[in-house]
Amino acid sequence: MKPSGLTLAFLVVFMMAIMYNSVQAEALADADAEAFAEAGVKELFGKAWGLVKKHLPKACGLMGYVKQ
């Protein structure tokens, strides 16, 4: 028994829908991971910059570059 053209068209559209959903779900997961990574980097940079601002004047003063 040979499948009709309508059956083949339905299967093609169905497979395209499945592929589209899988690609879209993967893109959303990548976007979420990227957002979390950026937030972590910004937080880490903020902490590091706070430490630099806290300790750099003391270090420069000890080396004689900045008079306190």
Swiss-Prot record:
Propeptide residue span(s): 26-39
Coarse class of the primary localization is secreted
**What PTM annotation applies here?**
Truncated sequences of this peptide have also been found in the venom. It is possible they have been cleaved in the venom.
A Gene Ontology BP annotation from the UniProt entry: killing of cells of another organism
Signal peptide boundaries: 1-25
Whether Repressor counts among this entry's keywords is no
The record's subcellular locations are: Secreted
- A cellular component term (GO) from this record? extracellular region
* Annotated keywords: Antibiotic, Antimicrobial, Disulfide bond, Fungicide, Secreted, Signal
The entry's family comment says: Belongs to the formicidae venom precursor-01 superfamily.
The annotated subunit structure for this chain is: Homo- or heterodimer with PLP4 (AC A0A348G5W0); disulfide-linked.
Physiological role = This homodimer composed of two cationic amphipathic alpha-helical peptides has antimicrobial activities against E.coli, S.aureus (MIC=3.1 uM), and S.cerevisiae (MIC=3.1 uM). It also shows histamine-releasing activity (66.4% at 10 uM) and a weak hemolytic activity (10.5% at 50 uM).
Name of the featured protein:
U-poneritoxin(01)-Om4b
